[in-house]
Curated annotation (Swiss-Prot):
Gene that encodes it: trmD
Highest classification ranks of the organism: Bacteria, Bacillati, Bacillota, Clostridia, Moorellales
Superkingdom of this protein's organism: Bacteria
Record organism: Moorella thermoacetica (strain ATCC 39073 / JCM 9320)
A GO molecular-function annotation: tRNA (guanine(37)-N1)-methyltransferase activity
Name of this protein: tRNA (guanine-N(1)-)-methyltransferase
PANTHER family per the UniProt record, alphabetical: TRNA (GUANINE-N(1)-)-METHYLTRANSFERASE
Complex and partners: Homodimer.
Gene Ontology CC, one term: cytosol
NCBIfam families: PRK00026.1, trmD
Family: Belongs to the RNA methyltransferase TrmD family.
Length: 250
């Protein structure tokens, strides 16, 4: 996969691109990240890419022309060869695992990192194909959201993770929060590893993990359960949790 990132702060990506899974994916040739400095496309001697908003108001607005020129420079094949052009924006769709899986099927992505008070609306009208938000909060710019998207998508690329089942069993990949994980030692400061995980009985372990994931989701993110394909056994387990909690409530 190729990801072009349009940014005015390419140096922010140095550590991100050279550590952990992202570094390995790049070394394996499974991920190519091309950092494009938007200022290189500014047509003024000071390389400014922002200006005052028409109609007045606080802050500055990112100009349309440098963004159009940068994207057009990345697409020598023209409109027919255009990949998704995604603007990092608090007005965008909320990013989730399903969206990561969708984007992981693309061969090429272009991510635009906004700054200042936002971007000229003509970028949305005539250049961007999608807007994505990573949450209902304000960040200085789109660089961190772009890193989040690259990380989530890269994990899903074939061959990137050593154990493919790891990506499938991560929180949200199954629609549920992940079950508790333990490693050695078996006992730590009076806290013991659940016996079922030491039993060697794979069916009991599978059932325990499923129930733990269900209960954790029920307690922390009950909204997710509406989108999960629950078995009759799952439903009975959740009903039992609900009944027990009801008995504890005065």
């Amino acid at each position: 996969m190729r990801v072009d990132v349009l940014t005015i702060f390419p140096e922010m990506f140095t550590g991100f691109l050279n550590t952990s899974i992202i570094k390995r994916a790049r070394e394996q040739g499974r991920l190519e990240v091309n950092l494009v400095n938007i200022r290189a496309y500014a047509r003024n001697k000071h390389r400014n890419v922002d200006d005052y908003p028409f109609g007045g108001g606080p802050g500055m607005v990112m100009q349309a022309e440098p963004l159009f020129l940068a994207v057009e420079d990345l697409l020598p094949g023209g409109e027919a060869a255009r990949p998704p052009v995604i603007l990092m924006s608090p007005q965008g769709e909320a990013f989730n695992q399903g969206m990561a899986e969708e984007l992981a099927r693309e061969e090429h992505l272009i991510l635009i990192c906004g700054h200042y008070e936002g971007v000229d609306e003509r970028v949305r009208l005539a250049l961007v194909t999608r807007e994505i938000s990573i949450g209902d909060y304000v960040l200085t710019g789109g660089e961190l959201p772009a890193m989040v998207i690259i990380d989530a998508v890269t994990r899903l690329l074939p061959g990137v993770l050593g154990a493919p089942e790891g990506a499938r069993e991560d929180s949200f990949a199954m629609g549920l929060l992940e079950y508790p994980q333990y490693t050695r030692p078996r006992s730590f400061r009076g806290l013991e590893v659940p016996e079922v995980l030491l039993s060697g009985n794979h069916e009991q372990i599978r059932r325990w993990r499923r129930q733990q994931a269900l209960e954790r989701t029920w307690r922390r993110r009950p909204d997710l359960l509406a989108r999960v394909n629950l078995s009759p056994e799952d439903r009975r387990f959740l009903e039992e949790i609900s009944r027990r909690e009801g008995e504890r409530t005065p």
